[in-house]
Amino acid sequence: MKVAVIGAAGGIGQALALLLKNRLPAGSDLALYDIAPVTPGVAADLSHIPTPVTIKGYAGEDPTPALEGADVVLVSAGVARKPGMDRADLFNVNAGIVKALAEKIAVVCPKACVGIITNPVNTTVPIAAEVLKKAGVYDKRKLFGVTTLDVIRSETFVAALKDKDPGQVRVPVIGGHSGVTILPLLSQVEGVSFTDEEVAALTKRIQNAGTEVVEAKAGGGSATLSMGQAACRFGLALVKALQGESDVVEYAYVEGEGEYAPFFAQPIKLGKNGVEALLDIGKLSAYEQAALDGMLDTLKGDIQIGVEFVK
């Protein structure tokens, strides 16, 4: 099993690489790529960790050696948010980066499962899809926007509020991966109940958690360590499913049946070919239904921007 981390010298990439070096199954290959010259050094550093995972790092303009033979590609390349920026501001730089990488993936490892971490995910995933379509290699079962960070934040915040073990809390999060498009389904959390005020406050905190970290880092970066953890969780789920483990369920932003929007974050069952089944989002509360209805125009607009970018 080969996993490639693209953008591996960045804050997310290094955290993700560290976690994967420790947690990938024995015998896995981990390839790191970044345009930054430090990348082979990051791999050298991680290679000293005594786990049965081989690691190589590649730098420069061409990601081909890292992508060759990859089963899973996790893309975190791009610029990070700074105070005052929203995820849309990132679009101007990151859209071109994702487009160029998708063009490489289409040629070098078209059958790989690709997880897009680079923001704005609502838009970068449709960009990758359009590029892969143009190349004639698009398989909607194998392209994912990694929204796991919204899920782990929700689990953490709910556990703290209700004094639960965060490892035992499960919170479905649907929609997209920025602002109002992030919708935690708090009515479906088992074993706890919330007042209307708690629901409103928690939902807002989950939607704005990225900004919370950007501001706390005071210009020194965005959410890199928690995102590395989230991407690792999703990457390991993909690896398990590809290796034949059954009943692997995660949340991700994928091309669905178009019931809500062309791409939508929802629970998915993973299998040997990526998405095995789209799972139902379940029954929503009146608050959640109103929030879902209210965000769809924003989400569809984000998707359309990505489609237009590739045309």
Curated annotation (Swiss-Prot):
One of its GO terms (biological process) is malate metabolic process. It is an enzyme of class 1 (oxidoreductase). Changing residue 223 to T: In strain: 569B. Its EC number is 1.1.1.37. One of its GO terms (molecular function) is L-malate dehydrogenase (NAD+) activity. It catalyses: (S)-malate + NAD(+) = oxaloacetate + NADH + H(+). The keyword NAD applies. Changing residue 204 to N: In strain: M548. Keywords: NAD, Oxidoreductase, Tricarboxylic acid cycle. The keyword Transmembrane does not apply. SUPFAM superfamilies: LDH C-terminal domain-like (SSF56327), NAD(P)-binding Rossmann-fold domains (SSF51735). Substrate binds at residues 81, 87, 119, 153. The active site is at 177 (proton acceptor). One of its GO terms (cellular component) is cytoplasm. NAD(+) binds at residues 7-13, 34, 94, 117-119, 227. NCBIfam families: MDH_euk_gproteo. Homodimer. Catalyzes the reversible oxidation of malate to oxaloacetate. Belongs to the LDH/MDH superfamily. MDH type 1 family. This is Malate dehydrogenase. It comes from Vibrio cholerae serotype O1 (strain ATCC 39315 / El Tor Inaba N16961).
